[in-house]
A protein has these predicted regions:
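Hydrophobic alpha-helical positions that pack around
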Residues: 1-92, 98-103
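Flexible, glycine/charged-enriched surface loops at secondary-structure junctions
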Residues: 7-10, 68-70, 103-112, 179-183, ...
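Active-site gating/interface segments in enzymes
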Residues: 18-19, 25-33, 100-151
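Conserved active-site and cofactor/substrate-binding residues in soluble primary-metabolism enzymes
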Residues: 47-55, 68, 79, 87-90, ...
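Structured core elements
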Residues: 72, 83-85, 94, 110, ...
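Short, flexible active-site loops
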Residues: 74-81, 138-141, 153
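Ferredoxin-type iron-sulfur electron-transfer modules in oxidoreductases and energy-metabolism complexes
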Residues: 131-147, 157, 161-222
């Protein structure tokens, strides 16, 4: 169908997480690499997801502001899974109650996906323009194994799509070595969670690196 429209090319990509990341898409589609600290525009690219593209179209062509958002409600323990068009600002509780309420065996609700999502502490929190999914997890799915010591296997570095060394960033973060964290490009972390997923020692690498990244960015902008 894209052949009907000038300037549109549909390009199939491998099903590889996190291929949908901004810099990963540029590399896969244009074979260009955005340098550390750089922006897509530096290599002649602008990346927008489908929701943003639709919002721009609605604003320009229909004079419609961004007042609603598509939200997927899902999870193995959630019986009434659905895709809903929700007004921005709607309390999360309203969405969940509309679909029958929180299941008894749900232990945690995640805003976002299983890899990059964040736990919801308050169901009265509002739906934001970036709220794409509500994921319900059981106790078994949220169970964390005891944290061990880093064995320097390098699996986290092999899995990192940004070419970082999470095992090193973890060590620097635990010692509060902010300058070294910046020198090792902690600010380039896209928080995909691949390091956490692959770590055989069950070290909470994503949580540690996310906090360290925030501290470094505050200093840079400072």
């Amino acid at each position: 169908k894209s052949s009907k429209y000038d300037g549109i090319v549909v390009l199939p990509l491998m099903k590889k997480y996190p291929e949908g990341g901004e810099k990963q898409l540029i590399d896969a589609v244009m074979h260009r690499q955005v340098k550390s600290g750089g922006l897509p525009i530096d290599v002649g690219a602008v990346v927008q997801n489908v929701a943003t593209a639709l919002a721009v179209y609605d604003a320009v062509q229909k004079n419609k502001p961004l007042i609603d958002n598509s939200v997927t409600v899902t999870g193995e323990c959630f019986p009434k899974q659905a895709n809903l068009l929700v007004r921005v600002g709607t309390p999360l509780r309203y969405i969940i109650d509309y679909l029958g309420g929180v299941p008894e065996n749900a232990a945690k609700i995640i805003s976002g996906g299983p890899m990059m999502g964040k736990a919801i502490a308050n169901l009265d929190a509002a739906t934001l323009k970036g709220t794409g999914a509500l994921l319900f997890l059981t106790e078994e799915q949220t169970k964390r194994h005891p944290e061990g010591h880093c064995i320097r296997c390098g699996k986290c570095a092999d899995a990192c799509p940004m070419g970082l060394e999470p095992f090193l960033l973890n060590r620097l973060a635990r010692h509060g070595m902010t300058d070294e964290l910046e020198a090792n490009a902690v600010q380039d972390c896209i928080e995909c969670g691949c390091c956490l997923y692959t770590c055989p020692a069950n070290i909470p690498l994503l949580d540690i690196i996310r906090l360290a990244k925030g501290d470094v960015i505050k200093i840079i902008r400072g």
